[in-house]
Regions:
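Mg2+-dependent prenyl diphosphate-binding active-site environment of isoprenoid biosynthetic enzymes
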Residues: 2-193
Length: 193
């Protein structure tokens, strides 16, 4: 974000130290190339989905009371809950502002739907947390919303902006959702082990 300075810039510098796989931007480009020809908009889409992902991680760390992420102190551990929530909101707003530069409103629609699903999943998780009687179907439904929505959207957006047919978009979105579910299951297992 080239228009930030001072404290906000310092917070972004700290956030950048967490690294990460940058999987979602890679999915945008991968599926853009698989179903058509990637355009200049795929680079913007990659930045948009990564900003939304980072926003969700900042909020998730606060909700979970996480002290570390990737072996570094979380922003909420360093600055309390207010700063990461506001920084997450800033990333979220900037991501949606960037969607306005794209040739169609498809990204805004897809990402708004994914955002609703993420919030719905977080609410469900808050109510279902630490329940030993949690049924498998409820677990998968919760994470289909919470995690998988933001894995399906990059795949579908990569395809949409490369000119894919609606059926192709549904197929690649389904792949992304399945990938997100698999990642969440592995992540949960690692929390237990």
């Amino acid at each position: 974000m080239s228009d930030v300075s001072g404290t906000v810039h310092d917070l972004f510098t700290t956030l950048n130290k967490y690294g990460g796989k940058r999987l979602r931007p890679a999915l945008v480009h991968l599926f853009g190339g698989l179903v058509g020809r990637p355009t200049h908009e795929h680079a913007a889409l990659g930045a948009i989905v990564e900003a939304l992902h980072l926003s969700s991680l900042l909020h998730d760390d606060v909700l979970d009371g996480a002290d570390t992420r990737r072996r570094l102190p979380t922003l909420n551990a360093l600055h309390g809950n207010e700063i990461p929530i506001l920084l997450g909101d800033l990333l979220y707003a900037r991501a949606f502002t960037l969607t306005l530069t794209l040739s169609t409103p498809d990204a805004s629609r897809e990402l708004a739907e994914a955002s609703v699903a993420i919030c719905r999943g977080e609410i469900e998780q808050s109510f279902l947390r630490f329940r030993p009687d949690l049924e498998e179907a409820a677990y998968f439904h919760m994470f289909a919303d919470k995690t998988a929505a933001l894995s399906g959207a990059p795949c579908s957006l990569g395809a949409i902006y490369a000119g894919a047919a609606p059926r192709q978009v549904e197929i690649v979105r389904g792949f992304g959702v399945s990938l997100g579910m698999a990642f969440q299951i592995i992540d949960d297992c690692l929390d237990v082990v």
